[in-house]
Amino acid sequence: MAKVLVLYYSMYGHIETMADAVAEGARSVPGTEVTIKRVAETIPADQAAAHGVKLDQKAPVATPDELANYDAIIFGTPTRFGNMAGQMRTFLDQTGGLWMKGALVGKIGSVFASTGTQHGGQETTITSFHSTLLHQGMVIVGVPYSCAGLVNMTEITGGTPYGATTLAGADGSRQPSQNELDIARFQGKHVASLALKIAG
C-alpha cells in the first residue's frame, strides 16, 4: 500500500480543481490510498472575502508534521512572481523539524501549478519549488513525454515536463481545460505508480 497526499493552496479555485484531477489519477492505481488536503489561508478573512478568495474549499487543512505519514506528496500552488504562493511557502517553512529528522528523505515529491498568463512563470514556479523538496531529500517526479497532452499544439494549454499546469487568465475567469486536467490525472497516476514501487 502506498499513501499519497495531494497538498495544495488555491486562492480562486483553479488549483483546487487541478488537485481533484491529480487525486483522481492517483486513485486509479490499485494499492494506493489518496488524501487531499490544503494549506491554511494566511489572508485575514475580511480581506479574503473582499477580494473574492474561495473560502469554501472542502479539503481539510494539513499540518506540517503529517507530511511524514505519506510515501508521496504532490504539491499544488499558484504562481507568485515565478515562485510558489506565500501561503505554501509559510507552510513549508514550518517543516524544519521534519528536515532535522530526515523524515521526508526518499519520499516522492511532485508539483503542479497555475499562472495568470501563458508565460507567467509556470516552469519557474515548479522548478523553484523543487529546491525545497531536494533539501528535504525527496525524489522529484515530473510528467514524462509519454503523456500525450504535453505535445498538444491545437490550443493554448498548460502542461510541462516539470508538472501539470493551468492558465487562469489575468482575471481568473479561465478554468482548467480538458487537456490540462488530463495531464494532471496523468501526473497523479504516474506518481502513485512510482510510490507503489518504492513503498514495496
Swiss-Prot record:
Protein residues bound to FMN: 10-15, 79-81, 114-120, 135
Cofactor(s) needed: FMN
Pfam families: FMN_red
PROSITE patterns hit by this protein: FLAVODOXIN_LIKE
UniProt cofactor note: Binds 1 FMN per monomer.
Enzyme class per UniProt: oxidoreductase
Positions that bind substrate: 99
Annotated positions binding NAD(+): 12
InterPro entries: Flavodoxin/NO_synth (IPR008254), Flavoprotein-like_sf (IPR029039), Flavoprotein_WrbA-like (IPR010089), FMN_Rdtase-like_dom (IPR005025), NQO (IPR037513)
Keyword annotations: Flavoprotein, FMN, NAD, NADP, Nucleotide-binding, Oxidoreductase
Ligase keyword on record: no
Protein EC: 1.6.5.2
Catalysed reactions, semicolon-separated: a quinone + NADH + H(+) = a quinol + NAD(+); a quinone + NADPH + H(+) = a quinol + NADP(+)
GO MF assignments: flavin adenine dinucleotide binding; FMN binding; NAD binding; NADH:ubiquinone reductase (non-electrogenic) activity; NADP binding; NADPH dehydrogenase (quinone) activity
GO cellular component: membrane
UniProt cross-references to HAMAP family, sorted A to Z: NQOR (MF_01017)
Family indicated by similarity: Belongs to the WrbA family.
PANTHER family referenced in this protein's UniProt entry, alphabetically: FLAVODOXIN-RELATED PROTEIN WRBA-RELATED (PTHR30546), FLAVOPROTEIN-LIKE PROTEIN YCP4-RELATED (PTHR30546:SF23)
Entry protein name: NAD(P)H dehydrogenase (quinone)
Organism encoding this protein: Paraburkholderia phytofirmans (strain DSM 17436 / LMG 22146 / PsJN)
